[in-house]
């Protein structure tokens, strides 16, 4: 073991034995210092938990590389310093503070509110856990200058996090993101103002819930459909998280009457005892919901992740078996329904637009373009979708947007992923499908037949440690130096490099119109395949997103079309050396 590293970590840890830290923290640090095995000490102190463009995220515990009230305190002091500078001269500066169901989330949220108040900033603190989208909504509703949400979204139970929001209700973008980071990095623990000014802390809750529920209702497209199918059998699980506060109530306000919750998962619990991981992308997390759905002969099963920004949807296939939709399919169905039915109801005025991330299915673009709705591509991360809404506020009408990672926003009153609104709208879609003699699965097949079949596959390659980071960097450099000329048996006809913002097609180089650069490459082939590659911003991984087009002549052909598409994906993986 590196003795120099042990010495460095020991010196850093000994600072945490001072009276500035509570007895529990000191005891935890002392145990690490006294242990023969220094692995825990090194993990906790070898670096500072980085405050990045999205805030903080890390394992909870004592140490500089952990989520704890002291690291949260320094982050908040830096954020408060930046807010006071950015809004210098403004009389009443305020922030909204919310949190999810995780262990220590309430403690961290109260710490955040205390520090803001101590810095002369009014803190609207939610009375208890609330969904991420409601926190985004509250920032706008209260005219606050910023917000903080304590959440680690769908990460494992050991984690917690800190998301920073700006006055538009979206996560911070340039120049504020780097400005906040600079301020946070200047702060030492002795500069943190932990003593609250209780006059500047206001608890919020029930009234904001009502306002948010009223806003979510604006995402509804056709009330008549729900009125005819109000007994649609819905099963819902919040996976022990914040969705329990809002989503059953939201479904009732939309007019649904047969709402069944997974009782074991309605219990708020940061240990997530009924799932391996509280991630709705994992089929295992849906097991209890599907069991209840089978018992009730439900039409669909839905779940939200712990902070209720993302969702999962399960519907029945022609054999009556449960079929879990992927994030692309969910976004596709929502986009299709919004456009098709707003058009039928005469709700499209010609100034509408939709937004999708560059790695999300191109079929959404096909649907939008065919129906004269503008479609925009943005980078991954919902803050970029929020940016597009803000750019055209009051000029053009945002009607929906999403990403392949199970996040969607079907209205413009919120500026982050919104599972309450998306779940309500998916139930409306299921009601509309049932009204027309279809299931959600049948509707998906109809979309494929009308707009073309496409299959998506996301591949993550893990490369841990510094050597792994170097390898990922080299892979991206190699792809840029010698891009593939063919993939899956089809020639590459277009290359997009978002690091240089240049597109090469037919030997011609043109500019890509994006607000900033990003380390992403895309290859498009003659047969309609799209491959996107980017290093993960939060994990030691390089990610490949593959979308292949295929032939599907009838709904019964879906399994064979999928099998053929998987073969093509395997060929592409081989071509890329994966």
How should these model regions be labeled?
Residues 4, 8-112, 201-231, 242:
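An N-terminal, well-structured beta->alpha segment
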Residues 16, 20, 24, 40-44, ...:
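Gly/Ser/Thr-enriched, mixed-charge loops and adjacent short helices
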Residues 108-116, 159-166, 309-329, 364:
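Short Gly/Thr/Asp-enriched flexible loops that form oxyanion-binding sites at enzyme active sites
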Residues 96-159, 257-313:
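N-terminal small/polar loop signature for handling phosphorylated ligands or for N-terminal nucleophile
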Residues 45-65, 152-155, 234, 238-250, ...:
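Conserved phosphate/anionic-ligand binding catalytic regions in large, soluble enzymes, centered on
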Residues 165-193, 328-351, 356-366, 419:
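Glycine-rich phosphate-binding loop plus the immediately following alpha-helix
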